[in-house]
Amino acid sequence: MGARSSQTVDPVLSRRYSSESETVLVVRRRPPMVNGGGFVVSNSKQVVVFRVDGCGVLGTKGKLLLRNGDGNDLLLIRKMGGIVQALNMVHNKWEGFGYDNEGTERLVFTLKDPKDSCLVQNSSIKILVHGKPPKISSTRNNYVEIKGSFAERACNIMDSDGKAIAKVRIEKEMEEMVGNKKDLYHVIVKPNVDQSFIVGLIAILDYIHGESTIC
């Protein structure tokens, strides 16, 4: 019997959204004038497994909501504001909140992105994963990092050991078919990685780059 693939990142939201095999997700942007923007994520069977709503649906800037295919809320993402954030000249701060069994919000990750748009294109973005439950005695594997260009649909999400746990790509045939690489692209998720967490990070990248979730 073959060895099972090692899990590089503990489930951030739920083990339910991971797979023992590599998974290719298809991201399709929704027209802002029809559906309020955002995007939907389908699996290889063309079944919608995630939906992301942004400003056009929620009516609030700096707020994103990830739902599963059944429409249940999975992850609420907020761009932090206030005086302290305004005084930070280097980074914007984002926080992702999952929900416990009683529907109470719990902080699951924190992301900081450069305020300088040039740095967004050329530097990595680090995410602190708070875990479920939060890890106290060890910080190992509590970080993931995004490297590459999301705008060009050529970026990797890496674990703390530098191994890719997900990739954003667009096939040449797909680009020729849709004409705009931003409208339809692939997210390739490695085995035993929480796909809902990965899609949550994609939602923030989409917003940072002024795409379907912004208004």
UniProtKB/Swiss-Prot annotation:
Q: Is Secreted given among the entry's keywords?
A: no
Q: Which residues are the lipid attachment points (N-myristoyl glycine)? A: G2
Pfam families recorded: LOR
Coiled coil ranges: none
Q: Which domain of life is it from?
A: Eukaryota
UniProt keyword terms in alphabetical order: Lipoprotein, Myristate
The yes or no answer to whether the keyword Lipoprotein is present is yes
Which family does the record assign? Belongs to the LOR family.
Biological function: Might be related to the phospholipid scramblase and tubby-like superfamily of membrane tethered transcription factors.
Q: What is this protein called?
A: Protein LURP-one-related 16
Q: Which organism is it from?
A: Arabidopsis thaliana
